[in-house]
Amino acid sequence: MTTKTMKPLVEPHRLNRIWGRRAVIGVPMAFLLLVFLVPFLVVFKISVSEMDGVSFRDVVTWAEGAIHFHIKFDNYLGLAQDALYFQTYLSSLGFAALTTSICLLLAYPFAYFLARSPADKRPALLMLVMLPFWTSFLLRVYAWKMLLADAGVFNTLAMAAGLIAEPIKMMNTPFSMVLGMVYTYLPFMILPLYSNLVKMDLRLLEAALDLGATPWQAFWRITVPLSRSGIAAGSMLVFIPCVGEFVIPELLGGPETLMIGRVLWDEFFSNNDWPMAATVAVVMVLLIIVPMALFSKSRAEARA
């Protein structure tokens, strides 16, 4: 009589592979939860806390054998009733959307040219894109302050050439702020687009041309749809930091440039109203989650 050896339901090496994959994914996810979710929860706790002198009252306390909650949503109600905050959020979203649109219009042609350039020239062109990151962000923004001032380089050259009779006010305007943000975040739009376009199968374009499509039709019907994931990734990388930008509006913007980052700074350090500042920050994060959710949905549809 013979006996058959039963195989295990999951082979050991496959089981090790599964647990190894989970560990590789789980460790970064745990780190992200630690450095992003925990600070957000702390900020949310401050937003619903009561001030007790110079400190915050505990949200949850234990007294007389019972749990007591000390949660206040007055700051959220005050924020919803104050038109200034509403205008600031709209202004921040509008400037961020405008900056993202301009970056996309400027970055797409350059990324397309970069992807279609000879392979031996691409590293040099990519280095030009990355070159601004070799210097301090603050110095780069402050350089625009020198260029756009009334006695700056642009006005001086224009007056010397006889193009204008007196300096044009460019500093402390929405124009100067948007210009600074476009300059700062343009590489964040170029790189995802290039990464997407360089992997495109050019045989699809050749097939479209062979079937009678014009180059313009092939571009709009093949190249642009296939680069949607790059457009979405670049747009998120530009839009999200622009919404909460503080340094550029502070250095280049003026009183007409309402940005939520400046309001946060004033609430925290000028008014010393940490609960209200935390409330503004929480609402800003929730507003940013919406485009991120749309981006995730577009990525899922692209993979499908």
PLM region descriptions:
Residues 3-8, 12, 194-209, 275-304:
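C-terminal transmembrane helix and the adjacent membrane-cytosol boundary/short C-terminal tail
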Residues 7-16, 95-130, 204-205, 219, ...:
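Transmembrane-helix boundary motif in ABC transporter permease subunits
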Residues 246-272:
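Glycine-rich helix-loop "coupling/hinge" segments at transmembrane-helix boundaries
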Residues 37-83, 151-152, 254-255, 304:
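Short membrane-interfacial helix/loop motifs at transmembrane-helix boundaries
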Residues 10, 58-68, 141-182, 216, ...:
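Membrane-interfacial helix termini and adjacent extracytoplasmic/periplasmic loops
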Residues 37-48, 105-109, 138-142, 155, ...:
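Membrane-embedded alpha-helices of multi-pass transport/permease systems
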Residues 3-46, 113, 123, 127:
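N-terminal signal-anchor/first transmembrane alpha helix
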Residues 27, 127, 131, 183, ...:
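Transmembrane alpha-helices
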